[in-house]
Amino acid sequence: MSSFVADKIVMDGLTYDDVLLIPAYSEVLPKQVELKTKFSRNIELNVPFVTAAMDTVTEASMAIAIAREGGIGVIHKNMTIEEQARQVAIVKRAENGMIYDPVTIRRGSTVKDALDMMHDYHIGGIPVVDDENHLVGIVTNRDLRFERHMDKKIDEVMTSENLVTTHIQTDLVAAASILQENKIEKLPVVDNENRLVGLITYKDITKAKDKPMACKDAKGRLRVAAGVGVTVDTLDRAKALVEAGADAIVIDTAHGHSKGVVEKLKQVKAAFPQVDVVVGNVATGEAAKYLVENGADGVKVGIGPGSICTTRVVAGVGVPQLSAVYDVYSALKGTGVPLIADGGLRYSGDVVKALAAGGSCVMIGSLVAGTEESPGDTIIFNGRKFKSYRGMGSLEAMEQKNGSKDRYFQGDTKDAKKLVPEGIAGRVPYKGTVQEVIYQLIGGLRSGMGYCGAATIENLHNAKFARITNAGVLESHPHDITITS
């Protein structure tokens, strides 16, 4: 037995419940700490939260909500290429400093065409242009609200006289004044020849004021990432996502330390060198270094820690999450490549521990599953509200036409009975809005950083841990009382 331990046991594996952070001298209050961090080599977040690329967690609504709070969402890939690209486009159009490629409608189109476009793009107004992109009018939902004749030409209902416009040099402060003075909500931006080059909306200006911490690109649009797999259509999917405006591509697999994943990484980086590519999942420093050496701009860490993941019991494989995060952090020091701690987080205290162990940010699934913005309908069960939540390795998720079986290297399996699930499906209590959940998580994170004397997440990496026993875990939670509130 001793030789087995000496030869085969190479590390002790610890997870979040095995440790507590040791309080340290502090000169910062929780409200003073800085939460800025990185998602990938070139993408900065204002809070260290990333929503998971899961079909019961992140679609456009979730990605918009988390970006407004300062994080970023990863749109899942359990859908057609066209639908995933559409989801990305919805996020990129949700807010803008100035919309540089506004949705337009051609002169001669019908009321039905305009209504369809408003529905598809979730917008309330469309500039009308001629064949040479000259602005000839604008049509809004107010113009169409009581219109019964769907085949009527847009020219007959649009506003074309006394159209208020501005030029490309106008900043948002000046634009806000123009909108207010003229009591309008949309301000077309034109060049010297009256060609449409952009659109500024009152709603976008208001949102920018209401959410100053929102995670945005250089054009004032919300940031969003999107997942791809290791399949024959990886490059086609990545191309569509990049064209739709995705800020990062996430190559999402169960085992990132593999030949096929690295080959896809090289192909995606070669095709789209301007876009950051995050790769996962891995659980060792060796794996992370291998990915970074081959071009990864971010590394996702976690094999089997998620609440809906069964990889560790089905395959017997994994590394307890705290140890995995620290091993990868140690390996990536000095590379400038961030690591994302993915999975195993149940409390805000776990977030603090994950970041203290070396995480740049955390990926959350169960913590935001069940929110208003997560995909799926709210169901009533025994008088309480729930929403569905499932692992991408669950049989449900893998059975779909555009399912996730390739994530678990079972893409060629045609018969559902031959699939080997590495996840489960279930339901979680309804949690309210993402804003409410993130507010509580940020509060716990700020408090933990204050206790550790860490003014920044980078400072938090210097915090020390105490290993605790099962008795310590019990002592850490409320005990010897009936909780009433």
Q: Where are the language model's segments positioned?
A:
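Alpha/beta catalytic cores of nucleotide-metabolism and tRNA/nucleoside-modifying enzymes
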Residues: 1-25, 105-106, 167, 227, ...
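Active-site-adjacent beta->alpha loops and helix N-cap segments on the catalytic face
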Residues: 31, 80-89, 147-151, 195-215, ...
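Bateman/CBS regulatory modules and CBS-like beta-alpha motifs in cytosolic regions of diverse proteins
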Residues: 31-46, 52-54, 83-121, 128-130, ...
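Short beta-strand/loop segments at the ligand-binding rim of alpha/beta enzyme cores
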Residues: 44-51, 97-102, 161, 217-227, ...
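Catalytic cores of alpha/beta
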Residues: 61-64, 236-244, 277, 283-301, ...
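Glycine-rich phosphate-binding active-site loops on the catalytic face of alpha/beta enzymes
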Residues: 68-83, 246-258, 297-315, 345-379
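Catalytic beta/alpha-barrel core
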Residues: 74-78, 104-105, 125-127, 165-166, ...
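Terminal amphipathic helices with adjacent charged low-complexity linkers/tails
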Residues: 77-91, 128, 132-148, 179, ...
